[in-house]
Amino acid sequence: NNLSVGYHGKSLIEDVSLCVQRGKIVTLIGPNGSGKSTILKTVIGQLPELSGTVYLDGETMRSRSRNDVARRMAILMTARVEPELMTCRDVVSSGRYPYTGRLGVLRDEDKKIVEQSLSQVDALAFADAPFSAVSDGQRQRILLARALCQQPQLIVLDEPTSFLDIRYKLELLSVLKRMVRENDLAVLLSLHELDLARRISDTVICVAGDRIDRIGTPEEIFTSDYIARLYHLERGKYDECFSTLEFVP
């Protein structure tokens, strides 16, 4: 609510107010460098808010312990995860650590949740493969399964399709949408692919460098005139039929 976000005490975007409800997907779009990741990093507590407040399930983030936050919010950021000597199942199992105590010993109930999470993202077939050996698309599924293992209310994702080809992008977002429906999750994410944002989002938030420029449904946001203005298109246009940016010579 009324967040001011930035780095080293310098505000980049002010008056950021947004709400993510369970069962809904809220997507940040905007030009590269417009501040989408900065907003997400502030929401998850990786960056301190310069002013304003982040609430999680009715209470401020600052008032909650890290373990308490981990039981309510799961995070998938842009940086590649490279755990060594871990199978995909091991990575997913780490999502239960907020519930296991310091020793990290999984109970039978924890193991059951791990298997359910792997099944829900269609990853049982490669669950015992080394995480370092599977494809980028399979890795993202495993990270989604790890997020599910936390049994969160909110999942925050920063450009989760960045390293994926089109097949895996579509598969990943299909899995994510199913997760939202089946688990009543709230999802806040950033995307740079406008066609995917239009397809998956319930609400779209447009970030324009120093402000939130517009919030609306995909139907309200994805118009030729507005997208051209948001992305400063001087020699291009937005195709509403295909949700793509096209170069015009």
How would you name each of these model-derived features?
Residues I29-P31:
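The feature captures the beta-strand-to-loop junction immediately N-terminal to the Walker
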Residues I44:
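Helix-to-loop junction immediately C-terminal to a conserved catalytic motif
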Residues G52-T60, V69:
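Conserved ABC transporter NBD signature motif
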Residues S93, D108-F126:
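Conserved ABC ATPase "signature" region
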Residues Q151:
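Conserved catalytic motifs of ABC-family nucleotide-binding domains
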Residues I155-D158:
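Catalytic Walker B motif of ABC-type/P-loop ATPase nucleotide-binding domains
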Residues R229-P249:
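ABC ATPase nucleotide-binding domains
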